[in-house]
Design a protein with these regions (language model features):
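Amphipathic alpha-helical scaffolding segments
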Residues: 130-138, 234-240
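Acyl-CoA-dependent O-acyltransferases
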Residues: 1-40, 181, 186-381
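Short, intrinsically disordered/low-complexity patches at protein termini
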Residues: 39, 136, 146-148, 237
Length: 381
């Protein structure tokens, strides 16, 4: 789920018409999750005619949702459990629950747009493909919801056999539970990425000799791992065009993660090098890579995650208004580790949302992170 703030009058009919066109081209967005007796997998069923059914588009009443001029925690409190936050997973199976909601929240001469799509039917790439189609200047495209079985078949070979199963291990589950129960209060920070600091860091990284080129994402990933003192770092990657038969027109969940340990993110070039071999995406601090922790060592490992949405996102072009700020919404009570979201805060600026129990303001000194995205939404940054 994301929220985007605008100034100017909300173009309600333009958004409604645009959403109707997007759903007509992608009727699976109006679908329902079902599972029959004895079935092992959940299915998405939908009307190919793609009607804009109830619950897909919401216009809030004035004052119904207070999201302007309040903190990130207050925004999350308003969103949590509301009709604007769609429910995926088992809670939505064999119900009439929508898997997508687009909502306009008016507030005088300004307004906010929330877009929520269930992670059951969409990963970050799919989300932003749909989100970007709401723009008046964007092309409305049809994406295929048909599951490509080549993903499961090729996953272990691409990211490692043990790595492809880590999410399902008892140790990983207990690590997340322990963090949520005993980790302490989660604090939200959000900073812009400083372009000048990034360029200086890229120049320095070239001297390391790991790679002739490092991206901004490489820098941010290595920086986040060090800031959080991670022993296990997860970086989701989009596997479209990296696994056979899966391309840009495929909707659904086609991402997995590269997992790193302490020796694998000492330098930004190591992140770049881990993605450099087509068809094989693996940490490279040692050759061969050190096996991932397991059992009690995995339970106790300091676990962090960083995911990059900025490469998928574009600003929204809507008639009669101007976009001011965009950022992800994540339930602070559901944070399983030290999390960072890289996203497109404005048309030209990249932001990083940090959800952390451990991070201190002093830790950010000397990093590539600059000013806070917004001092009201993220006070004390």
């Amino acid at each position: 789920m994301t929220i985007t703030f605008f100034t100017g009058p909300a173009p309600l009919e333009a958004i409604r018409e645009r959403l109707a066109a997007v759903v007509a081209a992608n009727p699976w967005l109006a679908g329902r999750l079902v599972r029959g007796k004895g079935e092992k997998r959940t299915r998405l069923t939908f009307d190919p005619a793609g009607p804009l059914r109830d619950g897909l588009f919401t216009v809030a009443s004035p004052g119904q949702y207070k999201v302007q001029g309040v903190s990130y925690a207050a925004i999350q409190k308003v969103m949590k459990g509301s009709p604007l936050e769609v429910q995926g997973g088992l809670k939505a199976v064999n119900t009439d629950a929508v898997q997508m909601n687009v909502a306009v929240i008016p507030d005088g001469d300004r307004w906010a747009l929330t877009v929520s799509i269930s992670h059951t039917i969409a990963d970050g790439y799919t989300y932003y493909q749909i989100y970007s189609m709401l723009s008046a200047s964007a092309e409305v495209k049809s994406l295929s919801p048909v599951r490509k079985e080549s993903f499961s078949a090729g996953l272990g070979g691409a990211v490692g056999k043990a790595e492809s199963k880590l999410y399902y291990s008892v140790g990983f589950f207990l690590n997340c539970v322990a963090s949520m129960v005993f980790g302490g209060a989660v604090r939200s920070r959000c900073h812009l990425v400083d372009p000048a600091k990034v360029e200086a860091a890229k120049a320095a990284a070239k001297e390391d000799g790991d790679s002739a080129f490092v991206s901004t994402n490489d820098l941010l990933t290595a920086a986040w791992a060090k800031l959080t003192r991670a022993e296990l770092l997860e970086m989701p990657i989009n596997l479209r065009n990296r696994l056979p038969g899966i391309g840009d027109a495929d909707a659904g969940n086609y991402e997995w993660a590269v997992f790193y340990q302490e020796e694998d993110f000492l330098r930004p070039g190591q992140i770049r090098k881990s993605l450099a071999t087509p068809g094989k995406y693996m940490r490279c601090g040692r050759d061969p890579p050190r096996p991932l922790r397991s059992g009690g060592r995995l339970v106790r490992a300091s676990y962090a995650l960083i995911t990059n949405w900025a490469t998928f996102a574009q600003g929204l072009d809507l008639p009669g208004c101007e976009q001011q700020l965009h950022f992800p919404c994540f339930d602070l009570a559901a944070v399983p580790c030290e999390m960072a979201f890289v996203f497109r805060a404005t048309g030209a600026e990249t932001g990083v949302l940090m959800l952390s129990c451990k991070l201190r303001d002093a830790d950010l000194a000397g990093s590539v992170f600059g000013a806070t995205v917004d001092p009201v939404i993220f006070p004390g940054n």
